[in-house]
């Protein structure tokens, strides 16, 4: 049986989908509706408060890393197979390299930024 890296990307795809489905909607409600409409104090998302919360806790950094990085892999997997389905089968390998390479690059950049905070 030939070895494949497909299960790794499928697991990252599903994890990114779960994060996108469970956490991103509530984050959009909080930052896009509750705080602007005065359901929370205006300084809730002030720079000083957010910076101290992120820089003071490795758990917060880990959660932010998951919420930011995993949806990149969900996007990469979905975008690659969308392009393959519309007829770009001949460059399937190139699409995989570009899409997953972009997701890996974004994940590395996210890790570097969170590490230095």
Question: Which residues does each PLM region occupy?
Answer:
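Membrane-embedded alpha-helical bundles that constitute the cytochrome b-like, heme-associated redox core
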Residues: 1-117
């Amino acid at each position: 049986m030939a070895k494949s890296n497909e299960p790794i990307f499928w697991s990252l795809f599903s994890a990114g989908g779960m994060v996108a489905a469970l956490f991103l909607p509530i984050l959009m409600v909080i930052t896009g509706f509750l705080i602007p409409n005065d359901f929370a104090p205006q300084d809730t998302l002030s720079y000083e408060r957010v910076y101290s919360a992120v820089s003071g806790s490795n758990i917060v950094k880990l959660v932010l890393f998951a919420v930011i990085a995993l949806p990149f892999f969900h996007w990469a997997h979905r975008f690659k197979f969308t392009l393959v389905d519309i007829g770009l089968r001949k460059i399937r390998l190139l699409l995989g390299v570009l899409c997953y390479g972009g997701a890996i690059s974004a994940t590395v950049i996210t890790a570097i930024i969170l590490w230095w905070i």
